[in-house]
A protein has these predicted regions:
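Alpha-helical transmembrane segments and their immediate juxtamembrane cytosolic regions
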Residues: 1-167
């Protein structure tokens, strides 16, 4: 599974595409089965959560190359959550989100609240408290394993784009 440093986004897509027949087959049983498997795979890709539960041996991830313990920069088992969320929306397994002011406001608050927590917020605006918060809560923002706050941020940003584009 050799992958040069940080070049594993294309192999990540290949792993996710290999998972596609499983998800489509599960959808014939129940879309809830798809969502349960998506969530379980994502959960077992969360290194920090498993570590805190003493279950790190169950972590789903590939080594970047056979001779080291370096992990993939984009763990496909974490990132499949965003891929299959989009797939579920396109297949109609998840209904189109309604466009309303309350959801737009909530999504905007989430996106703006992430600015201080971003590297730009820390570097350009001097939000030093955010650095401490990020260190203490690194699993929530983990890019490699696709932490839950990244997912919430993605959903919020995607919703704002959906609302702006219209039906």
């Amino acid at each position: 599974t050799y992958v040069p440093n940080y070049f594993d986004i294309l192999p990540m897509y290949m792993v996710i595409l290999v998972m596609m027949p499983l998800m489509v087959a599960l959808s014939r049983v129940s879309v809830w089965a798809v969502f349960a498997v998506m969530a379980a795979i994502w959960l077992f890709a969360q290194r920090s959560a498993l570590d805190s539960l003493g279950m790190i041996d169950l972590h789903l991830g590939f080594p970047a190359e056979p001779w080291s313990d370096r992990k993939w920069f984009f763990n496909p088992f974490g990132w499949q959550l965003v891929f299959f969320t989009g797939f579920a929306l396109m297949r109609g397994w998840i209904p189109k989100p309604p466009v309303n002011k309350a959801l737009i406001a909530l999504a905007l608050v989430i996106v703006l609240a992430n600015v201080p927590l971003s590297h730009i917020g820390m570097r350009e605006f001097g939000f030093d408290w955010a650095r401490d918060w990020r260190i203490a809560n690194s699993g929530l923002l983990n890019k490699s394993d696709f932490g839950i706050l990244r997912y919430v941020h993605f959903l919020s940003l995607a919703y704002l784009c959906w609302a702006a584009a219209g039906d």
